[in-house]
Amino acid sequence: DEEGIIENMKSFINAFSWNKGFKQYFAVKATPNPYIMRLLQKLGVGADCSSLAELILCEKVGITGHDIMFTSNDTPYVEYKKALEMGAIINLDDITHIDYLENNHGSLPDTFCVRYNPGSLKEGGNTIIGLPEEAKYGMTREQIFEAYKQLQAKGVKHFGIHTMVVSNELDIDGLVGTAELCFNLAVDIKKELGITVEFIDLGGGVGVAYKPE
């Protein structure tokens, strides 16, 4: 099993070797196993966390800083606090959490990511996690522009965009379509706000073909 994990991950990372800024994050909730986390860490893979328990797992295996992407929903401050103490990238799910974080923590880190819900703009791909327009997660396009304005005014310097509208996706067109939505949004943000989106986080993951067909 270990050899298979290493071989597959090396192959996946190599497929994106043309992109010098590429970084793979492993969704800890998928398999919260510290041995697998250590194995992937040795290959340069970060951790995508969505709870305090997952952050603690990362801490135990030595994953810290921007090697952690903290993406959660309806998040209590105690979880944000732990993520901030570990230097994780905070991926904001809700625009109201900007003030919530500042009021509770007293200051904001210089890097933030925001979670984009494209609603009906999404085309193609599977619906394992449902339709975006019916989902509880993420911000609308208008909210993201407002969130960026607020964050910039509060001193944030580095910005990212995240979205997760597919899961275990086997259709290349669905994956490409999701990426295009985010990159087009980044271009519009640069044009309208003058803010450069430095990284784009495509959640959901490339699917695994469990059967030969």
PLM regions with names:
Residues 5, 114, 202:
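Conserved S/T- and glycine-rich ATP-binding loop of Class I adenylate-forming
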Residues 1-20, 24:
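An N-cap/entry alpha-helix motif that binds or orients negatively charged groups
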